[in-house]
UniProtKB/Swiss-Prot annotation:
The gene is flgS. Autophosphorylated. SMART domains: HATPase_c (SM00387), HisKA (SM00388). This is Sensor histidine kinase FlgS. It catalyses: ATP + protein L-histidine = ADP + protein N-phospho-L-histidine. Residues 177-381 form the Histidine kinase domain.
């Protein structure tokens, strides 16, 4: 903040003055306020004339002592002022808000560093006369304004995270409700499709198989939605990694794709502690994403997906490698309901991250020549 150009000089208590005739003349130049004496009325010319009248050495020493005390107090007050100013500026800087202090003529009296980075937010809010919510660069801001001592104090708070949580909570409730409503009719259709398959001839059988695959996909989305809305809790049991590989190969037969893709599975013969059903969902999500990434390529290149699983120290490690389309928006990779795929719902990776965290693990997109996802979960009972 700007320093005031007219700071009052520090005051001296009256008790500091000695009572002598000539010193009392000097007191006449001082201003008395609430039993405190200041030098506001001290004029250089008058002080020179007064000093010439001090013939007594003792009086001169009294005056010099008084001035010395005043100087020391001035230094002390100046230091305190600078310390308080630095403290206030530090507090304002660490606040998670952009802060502008505006003069009556519209010029800026003060701005913190966040305000310096938020000119467009200020300009948009100004058009709305402040005290509003605005959207800027995919973020939401709450702008508030107040007036004090002829100045406007305007703050802009980033409420994007709060808005996102509200949106996710609302979408989660709606999705869970829809999943429950859809589940029963889908179950009935699935049962009828099974009956239809038994009576289908060679010509209609492939159609019924594709119908079953589509129904299986719907059921999988319903299951993922319900899991996401309820929260994840891992029930770890001792399982073979090879069994997980077999389950993944079976799930692959239920997924529809058009390109020629090689699938390379390399799961070790070891056993580990994990939730078999939940980790099966996670690996299916990454396997299907790899297939979709290969399908998204315009070139008719031979697709390849490699999936490995092994135990490394206290972790079970899974790697999924594919030569499909690169990840476009890495920052939103695990955001719920965020997807760039036409047939995606944006819950696959978000749910996968929840499952992995429930296993005290992590997911990383490695910066290799090939697109590689690495999943690590704690191997603990």
């Amino acid at each position: 903040m700007k320093k005031s150009k007219h700071l009052k000089r520090p005051y001296l208590k009256r008790s500091h003055l000695k009572h002598s005739d000539k010193a009392s003349s000097f007191k006449g130049l001082l201003k008395k306020e609430d039993n405190v004496i200041s030098l506001e009325n001290f004029k250089p010319k008058e002080s020179e004339d007064l000093l010439e009248n001090f013939s007594n050495k003792k009086d001169m020493q009294e005056l010099l002592g008084l001035l010395n005390q005043f100087i020391l107090q001035s230094y002390k007050v100046e230091k305190e002022f600078k310390d308080y100013k630095a403290l206030y500026e530090w507090v304002i800087e660490i606040l998670p808000q952009a802060i502008w202090v505006v003069n009556e003529n519209g010029s800026f009296f003060y701005k913190n560093s966040l305000a310096n980075q938020s000119h467009e937010v200020f300009n948009k809010a100004k058009l709305e006369n402040f005290n509003t919510e605005i959207e800027h660069e995919n973020k939401s801001y709450l702008v508030q304004q107040n007036s004090i001592q002829g100045k406007q104090i305007i703050t802009a708070t980033d409420i994007s995270a709060q808005k996102r949580q509200e949106r996710l909570a609302s979408m989660g409730k709606i999705s869970a409700h829809l999943a429950h409503e859809i589940r029963n009719p889908v179950g009935s259709i699935s049962l009828l499709a099974s009956v239809l398959l038994k009576h289908a001839n060679e010509k209609t059988k492939p159609i019924v198989v594709e119908l079953q695959k589509a129904l299986w996909r719907v059921e999988r989305i319903i299951k993922a939605t319900l899991l996401f809305s309820k929260g994840i809790q891992a029930n770890r049991t001792k399982q073979s990694l090879k069994t997980l590989e077999s389950d993944l190969k079976e799930a692959l037969n239920c997924y529809t794709y058009s390109k020629d893709i090689d699938f390379l599975f390399n799961f070790s013969d070891e056993e580990g502690f994990f939730d078999f059903d939940l980790m099966g969902i996670v690996l299916q999500n990454f396997l299907y994403n790899a297939i979709d990434a290969i399908e998204a390529l315009e070139e008719s290149e031979q697709g390849q997906v490699k999936i490995e699983a092994f135990i490394q120290n206290e972790f079970i490690v899974f790697t999924i490698i594919d030569n499909g389309k690169e990840v476009e928006n890495k920052s939103a990779l695990f955001e719920p309901f965020e997807t760039t795929k036409l047939k995606g719902n944006g819950l696959g990776l978000a749910l996968s991250l929840q499952v992995v965290k429930a296993h005290e693990g992590s997911i990383a997109l490695l910066e290799n020549q090939e697109k590689t996802f690495e999943i690590k979960i704690l191997n603990a009972s």
